Amino acid sequence: METLSFEFPAGQPPKGRALVGCVGSGDLEVLLEPGTPGTLTIQVQTSVNGAEQRWQHLFERIFQEQTPPALNIDIHDFGATPGVVRLRLEQGFEEIGHD
């Protein structure tokens, strides 16, 4: 089990919070909460050791297309594929009202 931390530039914090996914499904869960203006922080707890670079590249691809809101994101991962991670993040952004 590894804990990874990432930080990216962001816009303003949203008003809402969201919880998407389910750890019990062998997938992952993502908790999104308002953060500090201008900063997106992500903490990943993953069952896959040695995957920090893969996570870094995934987040860079997602956030190069859009400026994310200022959030604190906690991800609890149990071997989800990059596509599932992206899907869960997009679901979370939709729930908090960010395009």
Curated annotation (Swiss-Prot):
HAMAP family: Malonate_deCO2ase_dsu (MF_00710). The keyword Cytoplasm applies. GO terms for molecular function: acyl carrier activity. This is Malonate decarboxylase acyl carrier protein. InterPro entries: Mal_deCO2ase/Cit_lyase_ACP, Malonate_deCO2ase_dsu. Its main location: cytoplasm. GO terms for cellular component: cytoplasm. Keywords: Cytoplasm, Phosphoprotein. The keyword Phosphoprotein applies. The modification O-(phosphoribosyl dephospho-coenzyme A)serine is found at residue 25. It is found in: Cytoplasm. The gene is mdcC. Subunit of malonate decarboxylase, it is an acyl carrier protein to which acetyl and malonyl thioester residues are bound via a 2'-(5''-phosphoribosyl)-3'-dephospho-CoA prosthetic group and turn over during the catalytic mechanism. Belongs to the MdcC family. Covalently binds the prosthetic group of malonate decarboxylase.
